[in-house]
């Protein structure tokens, strides 16, 4: 079991069957990550070599459908390209939001952990959010990222999907290599100031830092 946005997030290791989701939902789980660094019994991962991109397995499709019906938001961060596309399509069947809790735009940093523009737009269309990750390799093609690279990602995403669909997904607990200015949570104020100085409206900054993610979480939950 992982922890993201409090205790609202669980990795697939804690969920063995679609039926078990009922128990997790009753305990407050609101976000499900079907896959992590490597492929598993549910889906292929962005960490796998391209030939291994088989997408969702039948069990994975069943779990995503069950999560969507229960109001549990599915997270496509770490999912392979095919798996992410299939998750978005399945969630759309139930009108459920999808999130990328800690992924960036591949257009700015060509890394398999980042998402392509079509998937980013689909997340926004679902009503979900994309959380900007602070890991240097996901921010820029350069070895070491700067605060300006984070600002660039945020602005790109705001322009692409709209200010209501961008959030912060720093991934500090993920042993990342962040920009020096964002070595820990104390750097958030620096980022907020840098965004405003770059022309991002203050109300958009407030939405990106908290309101957008809270909106999605507050709308999640067990459905009748």
Regions flagged by a language model, labelled:
Residues 1-16, 49-54, 181:
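Active-site mouth loops of central-metabolism enzymes
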Residues 2-6, 37-39, 72, 77-84, ...:
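Active-site beta-loop-alpha junctions enriched in small/polar residues
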Residues 11-14, 77-78, 106-114, 140-143:
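Acidic-and-aromatic substrate-binding clefts and catalytic sites of carbohydrate-active enzymes
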Residues 16-26, 47-73, 79-99, 112-126, ...:
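Histidine/acidic residue-rich metal-binding segments in metalloenzymes
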Residues 28, 74, 102, 130, ...:
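Conserved, mostly hydrophobic/aromatic
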Residues 133-134, 161-185:
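Short acidic/histidine-rich active-site segments
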